[in-house]
């Protein structure tokens, strides 16, 4: 059962995508972005679910679940290093890679949990535990950003990007822990699933309604995480550091 620990820790890395909310406030000030440009940041992070989730899910049968999770960690780690170039385009590329890595991770991490939880009665509670770990990660995001600015950056808000190597170091620890943990391999086989067959499921009215429900709930979740700090800045005249804690009310 110890093999479940590095898999659950992977959910902590999964929560890093929620840092786009507070980090976009700092990026807007550092690069002189307009509010419209800053509003584009969540798209750079989450739009990749549309393009990569189904293809990765299909390819995962051939690659293997653990290998797919390791790929997601590698992409995420690269995305955490690129913002150190301290340019606006590097920041956007970093957000994009963070989104791609997170997409691959969300597709592959839940199935990998099946490989380490042998008792199917415990699978549901294990998945719930993973979401709790992800929520803790999202809750810690603003604190990590404040640590980067106030401790690593000497209180200079222009050093907000130092949060990324901190997150990158955590990602590296997670990847190494998982890599060196023996995990039983699932049987790999060609499932015969295609993009057309997957999209064809939406012809079922029940599946379509469930899909739309998830789509709108996730949209509200991302929008709340992103816009809450902006509302506090605009309406209550909070500074960026103080407003950054507002999304935590949702995650707590």
Question: Where do the protein language model's features map onto the residues?
Answer:
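Extracytoplasmic
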Residues: 2-35, 110, 224-229
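Central cavity-lining transmembrane alpha-helices of secondary-active solute carriers
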Residues: 40-58, 248-252
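Conserved MFS/SLC helix-loop-helix module at the cytosolic interface between two early adjacent transmembrane helices
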Residues: 51-89
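Short hydrophobic/alpha-helical segments at membrane-entry points of transmembrane helices
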Residues: 90-95, 209-210
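Cytoplasmic helix-loop-helix junction between adjacent transmembrane helices
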Residues: 94-132
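Helix-loop-helix hairpin linking two adjacent transmembrane segments in secondary transporters
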Residues: 126-182
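Juxtamembrane intracellular "pre-TM" segments in multi-pass secondary transporters
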Residues: 185-210
């Amino acid at each position: 059962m110890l093999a479940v620990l590095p898999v659950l820790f992977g959910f902590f890395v999964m929560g890093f995508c929620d840092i786009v909310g507070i980090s976009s406030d700092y990026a807007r000030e550092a690069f002189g972005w307009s509010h419209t440009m800053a509003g584009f940041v969540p798209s750079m992070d989450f739009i990749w679910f549309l393009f990569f989730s189904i293809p990765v899910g299909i390819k995962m049968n051939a690659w293997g679940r653990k290998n797919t999770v390791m790929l997601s960690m590698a992409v995420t780690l690269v995305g955490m290093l690129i913002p150190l170039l301290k340019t606006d385009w590097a920041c956007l590329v970093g957000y994009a890679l963070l989104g791609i890595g997170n997409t691959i991770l969300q597709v592959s991490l839940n199935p990998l949990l099946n490989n380490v939880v042998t008792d199917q009665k415990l699978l549901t509670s294990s998945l719930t535990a993973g979401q709790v770990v992800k929520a803790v990660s999202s809750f810690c995001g603003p604190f990590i950003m404040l640590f980067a600015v106030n401790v690593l950056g000497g209180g200079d808000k222009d050093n907000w990007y130092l949060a990324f190597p901190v997150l990158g170091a955590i990602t590296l620890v997670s990847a190494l822990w998982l890599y060196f943990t023996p995990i039983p391999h699932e049987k790999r086989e060609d499932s015969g699933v295609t993009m057309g067959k997957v999209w064809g499921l939406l012809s079922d009215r029940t599946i379509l309604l469930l899909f739309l429900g998830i789509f709108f709930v996730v949209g509200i979740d991302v929008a709340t995480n992103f816009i809450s700090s902006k509302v506090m800045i605009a309406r209550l005249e909070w500074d960026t550091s103080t407003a950054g804690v507002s999304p935590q009310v949702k995650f707590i």
